[in-house]
Amino acid sequence: MSTSAKALTKRLIEIPEMRRIQHLHFIGIGGSGMCGIAEVMNNQGYKVSGSDITESLVTKRLEQIGIDINIGHDSKNIANADVIVVSSAIDRSNPEVKAALEARLPVVRRADMLGELMRYRHGIAIAGAHGKTTTTSLLTTMMAEGNLDPTYVIGGKLNASGKNAALGSSRFLIAEADESDASFLSLHPMAAIVTNIDQDHMETYGNSFDKLKAAYIQFLQNMPFYGLAVVCGDDPELYAMIDDIGRPVLTFGLEPFNDVQAVDLVTEGTKTHFTVLRRDHEPLRLTLNIPGVHNVYNALAAITMATDEGVDDAAITRALQKFEGVGRRFEQHASVTIDDGDVLLIDDYGHHPKEVDATIKAARQSFPERRLVMLFQPHRYSRTRDCFDDFVEVLSSVDELLLLDVYSAGESPIAGADTKALARSIRLRGAVEPTIVDKKNIAAVMQRLLKANDMLITQGAGNVGQIAIELAANDLYIK
């Protein structure tokens, strides 16, 4: 059988009704939600191409695995494509979208493409305001350790594999479900996890928390009646929704009424030891290689689902011991020697006040002797406005605070929701004196500010992660 025939056979097995599609083009392919799906489709034997406005480590890696990448958007980029896949950030004014519509090519959302991948598999979708990426990564690691070899699509790089996604040999597909644009409603999984609910991305839901909660219920009701919902019982909003789900439910948390409970938590550096109590199972003592109580919750969610899917305790134990974390989730980048000590650089993606607070608490627990210096980049003017007071409170708890300009993510500025306003309010609170920095003065600020045995945390969902890489490459500018 020829190579092309083998590839076609593979595609027909994976997604039988997509036999008419040979070439998929992804607009915005460098995005965290797009690159994983593109990689899975490439691994299944489809021709995959993509475009993005800027080159990145992600686009470079996709090129290395054989995906054609164009930097910049141009109608010529979609030549010979059969279908166009777009992220929620791409609108009809994009020249590639315009060309596709003129050519009568189907233009589908990322979530719809993920939904097609999931339709022919045993899909497990992970939703929630916080912790989706880590929970998805933990569950993937557990099921792989249990020899279930799942396909996975994650919103961050799994450090152990260096990938956002991989094609497995089993029927399992594990994927993040994105509530930010309500696209998770396009998914129809066999089982689902909801880590928590919070008032974020409220513009999608008409600034109505009730509409947001109703969307989560609809997401869970997209499962068949024999599916399984795994939800955090310690989240009062989630717990109050259980009776409306209409599907089998298992709860997890630290409170004793949960189906799966963690007790006897002990922090040891960046590790957390805890015991899991489950009905009809012996207590299981575990060690998690990432810090923070929030990550114990993420681990509990994954353990609950993995146990139900038949992963044994030995595999769960090995998975947690081996887990190397996720890119930009409390990722330790560098340790730079200075005077009689060092400065530790940690990078974290968290951009909501609760996520930033969780990072700060995990850092304090892991490195209590270090001074905490945070370089924070607010993400979106709307989030800065909606969570302004919470940001002021949380950011006031660090020892030194550096603030970058708001990463707009395409939004127009909002009066009173910029970095200067945030700095003024934090200064008035009196706990810490914020310093506004940019790329031009960051080197001088680091040289002046950092001391032996500090930890510097770069925090946010914008391009601050790239700044962390540059800081690490230049020894934090302190040498």
UniProtKB/Swiss-Prot annotation:
Segments forming a coiled coil: none
Catalytic activity entry: UDP-N-acetyl-alpha-D-muramate + L-alanine + ATP = UDP-N-acetyl-alpha-D-muramoyl-L-alanine + ADP + phosphate + H(+)
Pathway connected to this protein: Cell wall biogenesis; peptidoglycan biosynthesis
InterPro entries: Mur-like_cat_sf, Mur_ligase_C, Mur_ligase_C_dom_sf, Mur_ligase_cen, Mur_ligase_N, MurCDEF_pg_biosynth, UDP-N-AcMur_Ala_ligase_MurC
Enzyme class: ligase
Entry EC no(s): 6.3.2.8
Gene3D superfamilies reported in the protein's UniProt record: Mur ligase, C-terminal domain, Mur-like, catalytic domain, NAD(P)-binding Rossmann-like Domain
PANTHER family recorded: UDP-N-ACETYLMURAMATE--L-ALANINE LIGASE, UDP-N-ACETYLMURAMATE--L-ALANINE LIGASE-RELATED
Protein name: UDP-N-acetylmuramate--L-alanine ligase
The species this protein was found in: Psychrobacter arcticus (strain DSM 17307 / VKM B-2377 / 273-4)
The organism's taxonomic lineage, starting at the top: Bacteria, Pseudomonadati, Pseudomonadota, Gammaproteobacteria, Moraxellales
Gene coding for it: murC
